[in-house]
């Protein structure tokens, strides 16, 4: 309904990312200035949404929520660019992993707290307290390290060039064939993995598990498995380098899809006991270990392939493209499950993970010179 398009800005952030590379206030530098602006606007917007009744004024709430999503996506663009610019290539693996895990854990605090407070306090109070959480980010932004000096985008060029030049630079730097292969890899590397998890909650329900099992096993296990794997993966990348990590972690990511195949082979559980919960926990832990490892290497690889002059634009484009399998094609998974069943669906997901691994021969060879490591 009215809330359907709220998350659209996250998929389209590459459209305004070039403006963040070209135009910026000078009081805190190219990245920190936009970061502070977006955070202040988010604080005000979260307060504003608390002033409207979500039942009687749903349309207004949806519009403000979309506005919040826009500036939240803007904050993501700037943070991605800032992180790339302050980290050396051999620090990208661990640095990006720490950021991703901090993002996950930080989301639990206002998110979990808000859900709890919603059972006690009215909507207005809950969102006001959520808005106040933004003060932490605003305070930290003021004390962030200054990003390195980078040559600025030419502001005298025609406006449309701000969108064209970052794309042109990428294709010239990589070569047309290599650039197309790289973009194809972004789409394919996590395709099978993302496709497999799009219906994860429905699959667990259909296997006979209940809401309390999802809360107890799925949510907690997936969070800590992905966080632990991401941190371990970041450290391993310091030794392996990004290219080799893509190979090793990608293979683990592929194999762990097999856990869903194994679980689906049991069919619907008539009774849920300790054995069934252990099976579920084992599969979820394995899958999210693969997710954590694969994401750590994948995000570091995308960051490494950007030009510092156009970091925001190119990273926004890369991340938007890489999200297509889960956000765009994920809607097809329901039809596929209905046609072939879960067991065969997860086999299809496993095979869909193979083309991304094949692309590694071209985009990230195992012994390529410049496969950075500490």
Residue ranges, per PLM feature:
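Glycine-rich segments within core transmembrane alpha-helices of 12-TM secondary carriers
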Residues: 10-13, 93-118, 319-330
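C-terminal ends and interior cores of transmembrane alpha-helices
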Residues: 35-55, 252-273, 361
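Symmetry-related core transmembrane helices of the 12-TM Major Facilitator Superfamily/SLC fold
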Residues: 37-43, 125-143, 344-362
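Juxtamembrane intracellular "pre-TM" segments in multi-pass secondary transporters
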Residues: 149-181
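Short amphipathic helix-loop junctions that connect adjacent transmembrane helices
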Residues: 198-215
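C-terminal transmembrane helical hairpin of 12-TM major facilitator-type secondary transporters
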Residues: 244-298
């Amino acid at each position: 309904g009215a809330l359907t398009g709220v998350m659209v800005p996250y998929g389209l952030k590459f459209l305004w990312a070039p403006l963040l590379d070209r135009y910026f206030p000078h009081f805190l530098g190219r990245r920190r200035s936009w970061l502070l602006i977006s955070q202040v606007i988010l604080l005000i917007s979260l307060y504003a949404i608390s002033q409207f009744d979500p039942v009687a004024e749903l349309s207004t709430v949806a519009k403000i929520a979309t506005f919040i999503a826009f500036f939240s996506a803007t904050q993501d663009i700037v943070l991605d660019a800032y992180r790339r610019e302050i980290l050396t290539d051999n620090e990208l693996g661990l640095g990006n992993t720490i950021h991703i895990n901090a993002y996950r854990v930080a989301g639990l605090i206002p998110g979990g707290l808000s859900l709890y407070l919603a059972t006690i306090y009215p909507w207005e109070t809950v969102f006001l307290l959520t808005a106040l959480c933004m003060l932490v980010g605003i305070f930290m932004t003021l004390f962030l390290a200054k990003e390195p000096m980078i040559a600025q985008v030419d502001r005298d060029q025609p406006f449309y060039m701000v969108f064209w030049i970052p794309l042109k630079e990428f294709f010239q730097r990589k070569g047309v064939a290599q650039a197309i292969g790289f973009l194809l890899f972004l789409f394919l590397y996590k395709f099978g993995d993302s496709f497999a998890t799009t219906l994860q909650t429905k699959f667990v329900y259909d296997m006979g598990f209940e809401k309390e099992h999802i809360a107890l096993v799925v949510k907690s296990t997936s969070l800590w498995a992905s966080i632990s794997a991401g941190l371990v993966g970041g450290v391993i990348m310091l030794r392996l380098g990004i290219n080799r990590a893509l190979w090793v972690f990608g293979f683990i990511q592929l194999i762990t899809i097999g856990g869903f195949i194994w679980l689906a082979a049991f069919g619907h559980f008539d009774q849920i006991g300790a054995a069934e919960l252990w099976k579920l926990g084992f599969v979820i832990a394995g899958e999210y270990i693969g997710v954590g490892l694969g994401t750590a290497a994948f995000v570091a690889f995308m960051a490494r392939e950007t030009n510092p002059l156009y970091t925001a634009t190119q990273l926004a484009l890369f991340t938007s493209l890489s999200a297509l399998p889960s956000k765009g094609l994920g809607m097809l998974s329901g039809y596929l499950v209905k046609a072939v069943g879960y067991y065969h669906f997860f086999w299809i997901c496993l095979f869909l993970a193979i083309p991304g691994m094949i692309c590694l021969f071209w985009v990230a060879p195992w012994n390529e010179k410049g496969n950075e490591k500490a």
